[in-house]
Amino acid sequence: MTSAPSTEDTADAEPRGFAAERLTFFSDAVVAIAITLLALELPLPEGATGAELLRSLGHHQSEYVSFLISFVVIGGHWRAHHRLFDHVKTLDGGLVRLSFGWLLTQVVMPFATKVIAEDGGFEFRFVFYALVQVVALTLFLLMARRIQLNHHYRADTPPELFGKVYRGVGTMAAAFAVSIPVAFFTHWAYACWIVVPLVVNLLFRLRRRADAA
């Protein structure tokens, strides 16, 4: 007599049946919702005259800057996701779970943006936002690693794809991670998000030139 499949086997068998395209489409929808929620949090300027409107815009400057930063960040997450999942042909349970964890961080992004835009307690607000990014980027690296190790990618996948993903996403994860301790000393911790990638890219180019020489 054939034994009944275990609950764990049943749970793992179902995600394997999901088409990679369906997960990609679902991810696109979640990211779109996150960006929509991000925009809905923007405060409306108030005032009866142009001068009052300008003063109101200045008063909410931190919210607008935080929105622009998060829009670029979410866009970067989405771009990296598409660059990787365009080459994914199969899924497994672990990859689906990692994907849902990554999507959760995207949904949390509007809340993290609102937190970092508030006044007072800069260290806590900054660290919370940066930690959300570190978790999101780490989950993405784990997804890429699982796709590579379990051969979930198509045969025509460029051989340099995973190296580029690890370098690009890993650099951004390092930038956000480095900014966390810096935030306890200066509000210029934001600069780490730009300086670290620039330095890493410069070092990579210098190394590539040295190898080519």
Residue positions per predicted region:
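Multi-pass alpha-helical transmembrane bundle typical of ion/small-solute transporters
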Residues: T2-A213
